[in-house]
């Protein structure tokens, strides 16, 4: 059992907690959020506009958050170094504020007693890991690691499967991405990203993303071969990647479908899923996989040039991988003790 603390009880913090409750190897024992009081935590965890009402019990009692009859200590510190993670053996911390995303900033949790920090976002300097792609590079000596982004978690497994089988010369990615918390409901100021300041409810908004380039950090043989952009769209959850790649080895689309299907049933089971159904985005709300390959949606120009389509629940699927990485890190760390 891994005792876990969560810093930041926003979208990902809460969905990580919901996923953790489904994982018998994880016990969330503490939450820190300076902007949410205990009573409001109960409300926010109980009701969710995307994933529905929490089906278990949640209440505030004795200054703690009680979920499924188990107590969760609540802190309200702004500085990670002030959070007393070590007081009750909370060895692992999920850093989900979106603020402390560098090693230096995330290391503040170590001063409070945490032994390891998993950042639920891309990081400029922390080692990034994607389930199914580069766990062989994990070193228990790392004190801060990153689970990369939701889009990288979707893209990397698929590109690895294709690259290992056929070789990728180069590729371009577009992610048609659901709304996130940083966007605005009406036009407002956004000095660094003017288009990002436009209303999300009635616009398709082009945006930058580092997700494709980040694949090169996770899979070094693809470094410099992929880049991409994002379109923010007015849907509340589930995103889809449109990946166009030029292949070294010629392959029919049927060959590619077979390769991905075999991967989804083998080494990538639970990470990649395969569907030939006539699906749309809402069909994947609450889906646990990192990548859902849409076999009916892809197209091919010639044996070396193909467009592949993969869906992902950018909240639920990503949070499931945060939990998986937590368990993996804890198990590897235990072997070194």
From Swiss-Prot:
Q: What is its main location?
A: cytoplasm
Gene Ontology cellular-component terms for this entry are:
cytosol
Where is the protein situated, by its record's location annotation?
A: Cytoplasm
Residues carrying the site annotation Activates thiol group during catalysis? 177
Q: Give the UniProt record's GO annotations in the biological process aspect.
A: glucose metabolic process; glycolytic process
Record-listed E.C. numbers: 1.2.1.12
User: In which pathway is this protein known to take part?
Assistant: Carbohydrate degradation; glycolysis; pyruvate from D-glyceraldehyde 3-phosphate: step 1/5
Which keywords are on file for this protein?
Cytoplasm, Glycolysis, NAD, Oxidoreductase
Q: What class of enzyme is it?
A: oxidoreductase
**Which residues of this UniProt protein bind D-glyceraldehyde 3-phosphate?**
149-151, 180, 209-210, 232
The record's catalysed reaction(s) read:
D-glyceraldehyde 3-phosphate + phosphate + NAD(+) = (2R)-3-phospho-glyceroyl phosphate + NADH + H(+)
Q: Which residues form the signal peptide?
A: none
Entries under SUPFAM superfamilies matching the protein: Glyceraldehyde-3-phosphate dehydrogenase-like, C-terminal domain, NAD(P)-binding Rossmann-fold domains
Q: Which CDD domains match?
A: GAPDH_I_C (cd18126), GAPDH_I_N (cd05214)
The UniProt record lists the keyword Hydrolase: no
Q: List ligand-binding residues for NAD(+).
A: 11-12, 33, 78, 314
Concerning InterPro entries, the annotation shows: GlycerAld/Erythrose_P_DH, GlycerAld_3-P_DH_AS, GlycerAld_3-P_DH_cat, GlycerAld_3-P_DH_NAD(P)-bd, Glyceraldehyde-3-P_DH_1, NAD(P)-bd_dom_sf
List the catalytic residues. Answer: 150 (nucleophile)
Q: Name one GO molecular function term.
A: NADP binding
The record ties this protein, via PANTHER family, to: GLYCERALDEHYDE 3-PHOSPHATE DEHYDROGENASE, GLYCERALDEHYDE-3-PHOSPHATE DEHYDROGENASE-RELATED
Q: State the oligomer form and interacting partners.
A: Homotetramer.
Q: Which family does it belong to?
A: Belongs to the glyceraldehyde-3-phosphate dehydrogenase family.
- What is this protein's record name? Glyceraldehyde-3-phosphate dehydrogenase
Organism of derivation: Lyophyllum shimeji (Hon-shimeji)
Gene name per UniProt: GPD
């Amino acid at each position: 059992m891994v005792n876990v603390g969560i810093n930041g009880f926003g979208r990902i913090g809460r969905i990580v907690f919901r996923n953790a409750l489904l994982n018998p190897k994880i016990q969330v024992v503490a939450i820190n959020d300076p902007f949410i009081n205990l009573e409001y935590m109960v409300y926010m965890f109980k009701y969710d506009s995307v994933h529905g009402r929490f089906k278990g019990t949640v209440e505030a009692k004795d200054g703690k958050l009680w979920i499924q009859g188990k107590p969760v200590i609540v802190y309200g510190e702004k500085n990670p170094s002030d959070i007393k993670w070590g007081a009750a053996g909370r060895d692992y911390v999920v850093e989900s504020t979106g603020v402390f995303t560098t090693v230096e900033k995330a290391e503040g949790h170590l001063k409070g007693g945490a032994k390891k920090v998993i950042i639920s976002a891309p990081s400029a300097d922390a080692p990034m890991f994607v389930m199914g792609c580069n766990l062989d590079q994990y070193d228990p000596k790392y004190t801060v690691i990153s689970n990369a982004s939701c889009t990288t978690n979707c893209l990397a497994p698929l590109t690895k499967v294709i690259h290992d089988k056929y070789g990728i010369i180069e590729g371009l990615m577009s992610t048609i991405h659901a709304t996130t918390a940083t966007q605005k409901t009406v036009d407002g100021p956004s000095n660094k990203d003017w288009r990002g300041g436009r209303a999300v409810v009635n616009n398709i908004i082009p945006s930058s993303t580092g997700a494709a380039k980040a694949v090169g950090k996770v899979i070094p043989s693809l470094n410099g071969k992929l880049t991409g952009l994002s379109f923010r769209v007015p849907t509340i959850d589930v995103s889809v990647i449109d990946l166009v790649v030029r292949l070294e080895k010629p392959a029919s689309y049927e060959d590619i479908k077979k390769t991905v299907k075999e991967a989804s049933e083998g080494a990538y089971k639970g990470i990649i899923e395969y569907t030939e159904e006539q699906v749309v985005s809402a069909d994947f709300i609450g889906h646990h996989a990192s990548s859902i390959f849409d076999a009916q949606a892809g197209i091919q120009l010639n044996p070396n040039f193909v467009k592949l389509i993969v869906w992902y629940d950018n909240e639920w699927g990503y949070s499931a991988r945060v939990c998986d990485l937590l368990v993996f890190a804890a198990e590897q760390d235990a072997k070194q003790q």
